[in-house]
Amino acid sequence: MNIPAPRKDLMIVNMGPHHPSMHGVLRLIVTLDGEDVIDCEPILGYLHRGMEKIAENRTIIQYLPYVTRWDYLATMFTEAITINGPELLGNIQVPKRASYIRAIMLELSRIASHLLWLGPFLADIGAQTPFFYIFRERELVYDLFEAATGMRMMHNFFRIGGVAADLPHGWIDKCLDFCDYFLIGVTEYQKLITRNPIFLERVEGVGVIGREEVINWGLSGPMLRASGIQWDLRKVDHYECYDEFDWEVQWQKEGDSLARYLVRIGEMTESIKIIQQALEGIPGGPYENLEIRYFDRERNPEWNDFDYRFISKKPSPTFELPKQELYVRVEAPKGELGIFLIGDQSGFPWRWKIRPPGFINLQILPQLVKRMKLADIMTILGSIDIIMGEVDR
C-alpha cells in the first residue's frame, strides 16, 4: 500500500484584491503551513490617485470635492480637516451655529461609518442577519444627510468659515426622532451580538495588542482606546464645540477584536448623546462667516464689473495661505485623521501631507496574524476597519 508522504513545503495564497464595494483593493500575500499563518505581506497602491499632489495644484474650495473620495464612508471628517487647516492659518472665526451644525454632521457621519463597519465585520465571521439590520439604520442617516446637504454620500457641505447651507425646516425634529429610534436599535444589536457564544468564540482573544505596543506602532482611534488608553481628540484638542457637551470617552483594556467591537458600539451611543445635546442647544445666527468672501476681492475685479452684477455668483474664498506650517487633526471614526499644511503666500498650498488613520493602523496587520489561523485573518482585518481610499490616497 502506498502511503502519501506528508507535505513539508509552505503554501502561498493571494487574498484579494477585492472590489472597492467589498473590502477594497487590498492584496494580502499569505504564507501558510496548513491552516497556520506563517507570514502576511499587504500590497497597497491599487487605489492610489495622487490626492496630495492634486491638493497642491488646487485652491481649497476647488479641492473640497476631491477629499470626500479618501474615506468615502465618513466624508464629513475629510471635509472638516480640509477646511480646519486654512481656518487656523487664516485665523478665521466660525459662527456658533455653524460649529454646532458641523458637530451634528460629524457625529451622524461617525454613526454611519461604524454601522457600515459592523455589518460586513459580522458577515465576515459568519453572522448574516445584522448585515441587513445595519443598512436599515444607515438609510435613515443618509436620508438626514440628503435633506440637509442634497447628497447621500459625497456631501461637499463644509465651507471655510461655516457650512454651505442652513438646516432645512423640520430637520431638527426629524433628527431627534432618529436619535430616539437608534438608541433602541443599538440595544437590539447588543442583545443579538454581544453575548452570542459563536461570535465571542471568533473574536475573544483574537488580535490582541498591548498598551505599549499600540503606542509604539502609532495606532489611533478605536484601536488605541481598545488597548486601555483614554485618548480622544475631541477631548484633547477641543475643536468645534465638543467641550460644551456631556459625553464619555469609550475604552476597553483587553486590546482584542472584541474590545474594538465594544468601543465602536459604545461610540455610537455617545454620538447620539452629543447629537441630542447639540440639537436641543443649537443657537441662532448665521451659518457662515460672510466676511470670508472679501478676502481676495482685489484679485478678482471682474466680479464687480457691470456684466457680472446680474449673475447670481457666490464668490468663493480663495484667500492666500500665509507662509506658515501647521498640523491639524480630527478624531475620525477610524482614528486620527491629520493634515500637515505649508502655505507660501499663494492660493495653493505648497505642501499638503495627509495622515490617514487606516494606513497607520494597517501596519500592524502582519504582526497580528502571524501564528494565527487562516480564518482569523478576516476577523483581525475587519476589526482594524480600513477604507482603501484613504490608505492609498
Swiss-Prot record:
Keyword Plastid belongs to the record: yes
Instruction: State its location(s).
Output: Plastid, Chloroplast thylakoid membrane
Q: What class of enzyme is it?
A: translocase
Q: Name one GO cellular component term.
A: chloroplast thylakoid membrane
Write down the membrane topology. Answer: Peripheral membrane protein
Q: What are the EC numbers?
A: 7.1.1.-
Q: Which reaction does it catalyse?
A: a plastoquinone + NADH + (n+1) H(+)(in) = a plastoquinol + NAD(+) + n H(+)(out); a plastoquinone + NADPH + (n+1) H(+)(in) = a plastoquinol + NADP(+) + n H(+)(out)
Q: Name one GO biological process term.
A: photosynthesis, light reaction
Q: Which UniProt keywords apply?
A: Chloroplast, Membrane, NAD, NADP, Plastid, Plastoquinone, Quinone, Thylakoid, Translocase, Transport
Q: Which GO terms describe its molecular function?
A: NAD binding; oxidoreductase activity, acting on NAD(P)H, quinone or similar compound as acceptor; quinone binding
What Pfam families has UniProt attached to this entry? Complex1_49kDa
Q: Which domain of life is it from?
A: Eukaryota
Oligomeric form and interacting partners: NDH is composed of at least 16 different subunits, 5 of which are encoded in the nucleus.
Q: What does this protein do?
A: NDH shuttles electrons from NAD(P)H:plastoquinone, via FMN and iron-sulfur (Fe-S) centers, to quinones in the photosynthetic chain and possibly in a chloroplast respiratory chain. The immediate electron acceptor for the enzyme in this species is believed to be plastoquinone. Couples the redox reaction to proton translocation, and thus conserves the redox energy in a proton gradient.
Family, as annotated = Belongs to the complex I 49 kDa subunit family.
According to UniProt, the name of this protein is NAD(P)H-quinone oxidoreductase subunit H, chloroplastic
